[in-house]
Curated annotation (Swiss-Prot):
SUPFAM superfamilies: Ribosomal protein L10-like (SSF160369). GO terms for cellular component: large ribosomal subunit. Pfam families: Ribosomal_L10. The keyword Ribonucleoprotein applies. This is Large ribosomal subunit protein uL10. Forms part of the ribosomal stalk, playing a central role in the interaction of the ribosome with GTP-bound translation factors. The gene is rplJ. It comes from the Bacteria. It comes from Staphylococcus saprophyticus subsp. saprophyticus (strain ATCC 15305 / DSM 20229 / NCIMB 8711 / NCTC 7292 / S-41). Keywords: Ribonucleoprotein, Ribosomal protein, RNA-binding, rRNA-binding. GO terms for molecular function: large ribosomal subunit rRNA binding; structural constituent of ribosome. Part of the ribosomal stalk of the 50S ribosomal subunit. The N-terminus interacts with L11 and the large rRNA to form the base of the stalk. The C-terminus forms an elongated spine to which L12 dimers bind in a sequential fashion forming a multimeric L10(L12)X complex.
């Protein structure tokens, strides 16, 4: 018996470590999805660098307590799968929210972003945000716009002077 308990404690420790190290976690109820749909979801999550596991509620509850995350107990009812990402905050929410739109059977229970529990609505909202790279490129284009406009203005002034000089000759 103690070997089984030790194995379960190790599994809880692994889950707790995942929860601590992840910048984003989404907890879902996958009931009603076919095997093909779950496989499709797993492959989409894997492509985005997100780890997806079906876990026992008791183990997730104990791991969350160990990781210092409060407020998950009410969501850990029924079939539970956990998607975690250690790199991209938006990736799990983006993939799961998109998949949930196409497959009504997938229900988002809750999420954890940087240690804070968020609602299913907030997970959907985060899912609509662009990725980190997308946000960086948007910021860079906004920062480049004034410089680009200034360069166009300088070029236009130079062309205007050239045309005046040519017409004066």
């Amino acid at each position: 018996m103690s070997a089984i308990i030790d194995a379960k404690k190790q599994e809880v420790d692994i889950i707790a470590e995942q929860l601590k190290n992840s910048v984003s976690t989404v907890i879902v109820d996958y009931r009603g999805l076919s095997v093909a749909e779950v496989t499709e979801l797993r492959s989409q999550l894997r492509e985005a660098g997100v780890e997806y596991k079906v876990l026992k509620n008791t183990m997730v509850r104990r791991a969350a307590q160990q990781a210092g995350i409060d407020g998950l107990d009410e969501f850990l009812v029924g079939p539970t799968a956990v998607a975690t990402s250690t790199e991209d905050v938006v990736a799990p929410a983006k993939v799961i929210a998109g998949f949930a739109k196409e497959h009504q059977a997938l229900e988002i229970k809750t999420g954890v972003m940087e240690g804070n529990v968020i609602s299913a609505e907030e997970v959907n909202t985060v899912g609509t945000l662009p990725s980190h790279d997308g946000l960086v490129s948007m910021l860079l284009s906004v920062l480049q716009a004034p410089v680009r406009n200034f360069a166009y203005a300088v070029k236009a002034v130079g062309e205007d002077k050239e045309s005046k000089e040519e017409s004066a000759e």
